[in-house]
Amino acid sequence: MEFTPRKEPVIYVVEPYGGSVRKHLPSLPLIYWDDAAVTRGDGIFESLLVRDGKVANIARHSARFVNSAQALELPEPQIEKWKEATELAIADYFGGDETGEAKCTWTYTRGRASTGHPSAWVVVQAIDKKLLEQREKGVKVMTTPRLWHVAEELPAKTLNYAATMATLRLAKGKGFDDVIFVDPDSGIVLEGATSSVVAVRGNKLRTPAAKGILSGTTQAALFEYAQQQGYRCKAKEITPEYLERCDSVWLVSSVRTAVRVTSLNDAKLKAPDNAAEIRGLLDAALAR
């Protein structure tokens, strides 16, 4: 029987200093008006794929989560407690039938200004149908300069996505589905709004090498596995013109997984013969 996603998310609150975890009703408020997540966007998060009852690529997500907390000088996350909350939320969400997919989000903020106590919670919820459609149909993408600077010394996945979301709204208003950011000075490719860019030419997989790019957990898993399967994987400087000449271009991320770029600005990109193979590589990488 096919798994039917729940309408309501499952939420577990995590005690940041390693205490208990507890279930939270989604119909009740969770954070206060003076929480730094609301007033400053001061916090970190990770989006994880749950597939058949298990979190994909959890070691890389956990490592980046800890690094992000360190970069923002938040108390070190007690990862075992986050994993415990995640397992409980997954069990509640799937109700014993651990087939199908879901999205899991870890959120960790600096907390209330009045208490200085961090806020932390885990959510498991249905994957947006639009993301599932994009896996199958691909996305139309426009390139755009990233006009804000990302410090190399702050390699954190923070909650402050306001500028990125504004850029996505602009792109969608122009008929595109997504964006690829480029350096405003050099024009080299950086990353997608919520994804890493991967270009395929023959048996070569390439991803941008540039300053200010957040390390992609999904891209790293893909490259590690693909290398073992005989692909030549490398990070290098990439231009939009290079992408247009490739066999295929992909946006890879944890929940949406691999989405093919069908057009870049005004250029339609050809459909590759090995699209299923590339998706299969990523699925296999995430299943390990």
Q: Which stretches of residues belong to each language-model region?
A:
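Helix-start/capping segments and mature chain N-termini
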Residues: 1-80, 84-88, 114-288
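Short, acidic/charged, Gly/Pro-enriched secondary-structure junctions
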Residues: 80-112
